[in-house]
């Protein structure tokens, strides 16, 4: 990772821009988490306790999930190699799970319900994702697509050229989407004066968009053949949100939601295979992908509105 990441020098010490953006994102996330805690009138010390737990648990879970699901790492797996986290190798989903675990532990210690903290967590998380994904622009390998074969896209600002091929800057799209979600949740909380309902809504929106972006990524990060392991985890995220929304509308809707999830899973595998192995235009395939993922997103929003819940 060191050879592939842009560095800077400060007071005689070497720093890395990617790490700086991750740290900036973490700081923004914790600041907004504290702000939303104040708006929700959480118990004194809740935000401080969460902050103390979140960073170590986020790093730990991110590293552990990477070590478990990155198949290239398995060939050199050892406890010593797993502990050498400073050389790179982290999972975004693992970081989110670590933050959720920190929120749950905080709720247990403070003897308060966990759900309000998880709502606050989901509303603040896009700030971290936005900055962390932007930081990938200072690496050579993270956050880029397969080689582009569409001239107008290859010559746009969304493309990165390495002298041989042009690649889509997927990290830019992810950062922009996370930024939009951060603003959306901030405006939503400001209007409603509560973060209630943010958890499921965030799982639905973040899960569907990240499932698409993980498909666009082709950086060998946590992949098995043409399938991204993180894509599967993000798909589980939006599927869980969809089914929970459906449960509020009756058992019949749960069956429909499960059927839709199965349909989307089958369609996604088929599209992934075609993207990886066929000569069909990637633009057409990704247009179909967007329509496919719009199905659970739209259905989830419909169930949310129908159930008249936050």
Which residue ranges define each predicted feature?
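A feature for loop-to-transmembrane-helix boundaries and adjacent hydrophobic helices
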Residues: 1-310
């Amino acid at each position: 990772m060191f050879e592939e990441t842009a560095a800077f020098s400060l007071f005689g010490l070497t720093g890395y821009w990617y790490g700086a953006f991750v740290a900036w994102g973490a700081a923004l996330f914790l600041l907004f988490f504290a702000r939303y805690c104040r708006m929700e009138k959480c118990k004194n010390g809740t935000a401080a306790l969460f902050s103390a737990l979140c960073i170590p648990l986020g790093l730990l879970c991110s590293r552990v999930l990477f070590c478990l699901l990155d198949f290239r790492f398995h060939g050199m797996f050892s406890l010593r190699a797993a502990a050498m986290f400073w050389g790179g190798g982290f999972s975004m989903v693992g970081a989110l799970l670590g933050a959720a675990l920190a929120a749950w532990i905080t709720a247990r210690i403070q003897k308060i319900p966990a759900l309000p903290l998880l709502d606050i967590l989901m509303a603040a998380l896009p700030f971290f994702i936005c900055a962390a994904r932007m930081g990938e622009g200072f690496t050579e390998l993270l956050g880029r697509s397969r080689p582009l074969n569409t001239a107008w896209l290859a010559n746009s600002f969304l493309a990165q050229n390495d002298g041989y091929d042009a690649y889509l800057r997927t990290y830019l799209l992810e950062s922009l989407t996370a930024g939009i979600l951060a603003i959306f949740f901030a405006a939503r909380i400001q209007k409603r004066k509560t973060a209630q309902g943010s958890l499921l809504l965030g799982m639905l929106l973040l899960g569907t968009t990240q499932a698409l972006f993980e498909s666009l990524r082709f950086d060998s990060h946590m992949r098995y053949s043409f399938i991204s392991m993180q894509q599967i985890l993000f798909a589980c995220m939006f599927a869980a949100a969809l089914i929970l929304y459906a449960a509020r509308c009756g058992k019949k809707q749960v069956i429909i939601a499960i059927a839709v999830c199965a349909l989307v899973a089958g369609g996604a595998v088929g599209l992934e295979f075609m993207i990886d192995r066929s000569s069909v235009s990637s633009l057409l395939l990704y247009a179909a992908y967007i329509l496919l993922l719009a199905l659970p997103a739209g259905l989830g929003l419909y169930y949310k509105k129908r159930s008249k819940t936050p």
